[in-house]
């Protein structure tokens, strides 16, 4: 019986269709499809070779399928990692290169690196010696033993096989080889430099030997700062500020506080009325004198004090012709004449109804 691998299968392909396709060259014992690839078991080796020769790159539902003999990897094979491969290199060319040193069971290219499985370990060692750091298709490739394995748990590996060094008998997290590929030796150097290895965290923070000895001064400073920032200190500061405010308010004059309180509590005052605050002594006398002077100045102003509305203002009396005028009354006569002229002009100007002619002018 020969097992064949069928790759790049279309979604429309069925097991019955694949079986009937391979039965043209021999008896098919088994046919299995797994996603986009499958396996076919043919009884005769000659029939299997004919199927590979005729069905490889056969177009099925518009897709070229791949047919080749299935390669069972031997348990004793040696896996090599080949890095820095040319992007134009193919599996067949890389396989032929390594077959110069021994039989190759499997060859897989992944981007710019590949994995080559060789049947014998001595052939793999010879391939490393002969091909590592050599030119192949214009690029210098690197060949070394592969340390990658299938991990049973993330970051753990397996006791039966470490994925870092490939050896058995220890977990991957306990491997002496670190991630960079170097052997880590942290037993004696760590103990000599830092003393005893730290025990698990059984004590609370701050009580451990590793914090108090090294950071004693810092711990004392932290305690002082914490005491200064305590709740009692903040409360005392707030109380002192409150006492200072009360003492300052108590020093204000009692009379001023009483007058202000009466002014604020009075309900008969106009909210828009502006009054001067009560003062005492010379300040009150000066304020009264200033108010009286302002009143006299306003009364003596003829232009701004005069009401210019003809409706609210009374007409000034016009002197008669029979009245005589003596020396010293020219100023009074001139003032009366000016008042008469202004009043007559204003009356002639504002006597007519302002809104009577609105209808006549609204048409324009």
Swiss-Prot record:
Modified residues (Phosphoserine): 86, 309
CDD domains: RRM1_RBM4, RRM2_RBM4
RRM domain segment(s): 2-72, 78-148
Glycyl lysine isopeptide (Lys-Gly) (interchain with G-Cter in SUMO2) crosslink, residue number(s): 79, 92
Localization terms from the record: Nucleus; Nucleus, Nucleolus; Nucleus speckle; Cytoplasm
Gene3D superfamilies: 3.30.70.330, Zinc finger, CCHC-type (4.10.60.10)
Molecular-function GO terms, alphabetical: cyclin binding; miRNA binding; mRNA 3'-UTR binding; mRNA binding; pre-mRNA intronic binding; pre-mRNA intronic pyrimidine-rich binding; RNA binding; zinc ion binding
PTM annotation, UniProt: Phosphorylation on Ser-309 is induced upon cell muscle differentiation. Phosphorylated. Phosphorylated in vitro on Ser-309 by SRPK1. Phosphorylation on Ser-309 is induced upon cell stress signaling, which alters its subcellular localization and may modulate its activity on IRES-mediated mRNA translation.
Highest taxon above the source species: Eukaryota
Primary role: RNA-binding factor involved in multiple aspects of cellular processes like alternative splicing of pre-mRNA and translation regulation. Modulates alternative 5'-splice site and exon selection. Acts as a muscle cell differentiation-promoting factor. Activates exon skipping of the PTB pre-mRNA during muscle cell differentiation. Antagonizes the activity of the splicing factor PTBP1 to modulate muscle cell-specific exon selection of alpha tropomyosin. Binds to intronic pyrimidine-rich sequence of the TPM1 and MAPT pre-mRNAs.
Protein name: RNA-binding protein 4
Gene: RBM4
């Amino acid at each position: 019986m020969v097992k064949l691998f069928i790759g790049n299968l279309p979604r429309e392909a069925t097991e019955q269709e694949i079986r009937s396709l391979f039965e043209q060259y021999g008896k098919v014992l088994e046919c299995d499809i797994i996603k986009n690839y499958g396996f076919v078991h043919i009884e005769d080796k000659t029939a299997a070779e004919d199927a590979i020769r005729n069905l490889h790159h056969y177009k099925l539902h518009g897709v070229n399928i791949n047919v080749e003999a299935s390669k069972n990897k031997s348990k004793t094979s040696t896996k090599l990692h080949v890095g820095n491969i040319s992007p134009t290199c193919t599996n067949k060319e890389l396989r032929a290169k390594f077959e110069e040193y021994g039989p190759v069971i499997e060859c897989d290219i992944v981007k710019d690196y590949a994995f080559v499985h060789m049947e014998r370990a001595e052939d793999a060692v010879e391939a490393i010696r002969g091909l590592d750091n050599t030119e192949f298709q214009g690029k210098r490739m690197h060949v070394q033993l592969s340390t990658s394995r299938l991990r049973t748990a993330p970051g753990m590996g397996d006791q039966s096989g470490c994925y870092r060094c490939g050896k058995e008998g220890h977990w991957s997290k306990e491997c002496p080889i670190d991630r960079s590929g170097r052997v880590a030796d942290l037993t004696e150097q760590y103990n000599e430099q830092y003393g005893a290895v730290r025990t698990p965290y059984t004590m609370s923070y701050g009580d451990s030997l590793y914090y108090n000895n090294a950071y004693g001064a810092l711990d004392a400073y932290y305690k002082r700062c914490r005491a200064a920032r305590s709740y009692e200190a903040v409360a005392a500061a707030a109380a002192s500020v409150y006492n200072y405010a009360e003492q300052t308010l108590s020093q204000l004059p009692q009379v001023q506080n009483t007058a202000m309180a009466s002014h604020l509590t009075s309900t008969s005052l106009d909210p828009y009325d502006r009054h001067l605050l009560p003062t005492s002594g010379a300040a009150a006398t000066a304020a009264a004198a200033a108010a009286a002077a302002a009143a006299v100045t306003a009364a003596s102003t003829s232009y701004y004090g005069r009401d210019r509305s003809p409706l609210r203002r009374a007409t000034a009396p016009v002197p008669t012709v029979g009245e005589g005028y003596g020396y010293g009354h020219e100023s009074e006569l001139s003032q009366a004449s000016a008042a008469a002229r202004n009043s007559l002009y204003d009356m002639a100007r504002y006597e007519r109804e302002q809104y009577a002619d609105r209808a006549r002018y609204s048409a324009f």
